[in-house]
Amino acid sequence: MAPAQVASGRCTPAWPKDALRISFGIIWLIDAVLKWLPGFRSGYMNAIRGEAQGQPGWLKPWFDFWINFQHPRVTLFAYLVAVVETLIALALIAGFARKVTYISAIVFSLLIWGTAEGFGGPYTSGASDIGTAIIYAVVFAALLALSYYAGPSRYSADYYIEKRISWWWKIAETRRPAPAQAPTGAPTLATMSATTATNGTATESRRAT
């Protein structure tokens, strides 16, 4: 794959960001597989209720809303979480609709962090971390930023879809890709035509003389 040009003028390979995306996608796929197990569905609501315990009083309406909203249809929401995580994982690995995938995954991760992980709290004595979903959101934000600076990714489904669907870059890229430029010194169609015409004229002139 062609290296990306950075501000310093040095060329850096573009494959590391693709390796990060695919590796992160594999991690998400493993996590998604676990969401399809019966244990996740059976303990889904208990996990949210457990995180609501000990939270500050001003957060009580937030957790009450999600508990009351999901409780009548717990199985549906448990399956929905499994489906969303699976789709995100597959999109990451394949490099499909990357911009939409990254933004959707950021929103989804923050929602998980604010419900099933209780914002990483309650932050009392003995608390040791702020939750994993917020870290996932940061990684997705980093991937989104990398896609802005590195541009299209050859190791992705988007790269090939963009060749066939002109507007797909709006789904896949954070900015419009620059038009492909011919390498320096490479003959263009116009140059080749002009050269051919010049050679033909020169040949006719020699014949005339």
Which residues does each PLM region occupy?
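Extended, low-polarity transmembrane helix blocks
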Residues: 1-84, 94-209
